Amino acid sequence: MRTQTFPPSSSSSRTTHPKKNRHSSNSSSMALVTPAKSSTGAAPKQSSQSGWDYWTRVYSDDAQTTGTPRDVRISDMLSSESLIRAKLLFLNVPSLPSAHKNIILNLVKRELNHDISIQDVVVVPPAKWFLNFYRPEDALKVMKHLNGYSYRGHILAVRFCYPDGTYGDESALTELVQCTNSAKGRILEKKDIVQDTFAVECWTKTEFDSLKVFEKELTNLLKAHAYLPYHTVLQSMRNLFTCKVQSELSSMFISDALAQWPTGLIRIFNRNVKVVSNTMCLSSSSYYTQRIHDSALEGGCSVHRNSWEPTVPDDIRSEVQLIQYTNSFLGHFGPQNIDVDIPIRILAQSLRGTWPKTGPKLAALLTEISSGFVLINRVLYLSSNLHHHEKIIDNLACFQDDCTDVYFLPLSCTTEDQKGKTVDYEDI
């Protein structure tokens, strides 16, 4: 085996220059050469530049378009409650540590060994679990396997939850699965399990009946088609409920609502009617299911809202969001009478969760959490809006004029001559 050696003289005779000096000399020489080349020839091509320099320039260039921002992320869309098709309630459950969701998900995955899609897990102390499912058949598999299952010394009891708060057994869930398989995501019609989408206390009896009729006619119109253009549906409903031509469906309330805020009126029926981009369809239609699938592949979908809206009422989760939205709302519609005006009552009905569902309760909450709102004589104003300032002055002036009116109070008299006497109310 031969080895190659280098004489020590060769290494010692070579002069070693510091890297810093060598690089500085090279850079200075390049600085001298570069102007001469740029004056005589064209600039070097991008392919000849350093890769790091090129991509640094690309990512730091503000002029590069990054595409239109998505209104909704895929994670937000998948967490929407509108995608829930079945819900299970677990009773007699053990107490769990903070990472309870992962523990429950691992339990389902370990015991079933199936592709189970769970939308969310909600733990309600001390002894309740709620599991939301995208597909009823997944809920049925979990219910069959875990009902009566012994887990950490507890015998689990599983019940099927109707949206109205009542509970059903395995046969009720099986019926829902059969109905879903036969009609592509349609909800049970024999059991009216869909909650009312608007509160009764916010409307008069006539208005409530008109809303019921409007929902029925809107649903019948969409049942005959897979989907319809949004503005086509609005025009059809305007013609149907117009008061210009007297008919059984003529309604001044519906006509005013469609004229003032049609987008908000449609949102009241969000559980059954969906607006996707510029089209409208039923939530149980195959078209809506396909659009959800396509949006998942694209990474998001556009949300139909008015240009003045910072978001949609469905997405309001905090008081800060509610204040921001109501500022834009009152800036667009102007001061709102909390008992009479249609837009503010529609807004109250459009909020989800535990937000107030009537105009007076919503106004009371807004004036409590923010000084930017003022409630005078049952009218809600913006305290920082100049136009609203004028309305407030007019309102107070009218109120003062009403208080200074002269009222006459008849007195109980003993004689016939005194019965006709009256007294000035201000003199009392």
Swiss-Prot record:
Sequence segments annotated as region (Disordered): 1-49
Domain of life: Eukaryota
GO molecular function, one term: nucleic acid binding
Biased composition (Polar residues): 24-49
Name of the protein this chain belongs to: Uncharacterized protein F07F6.1
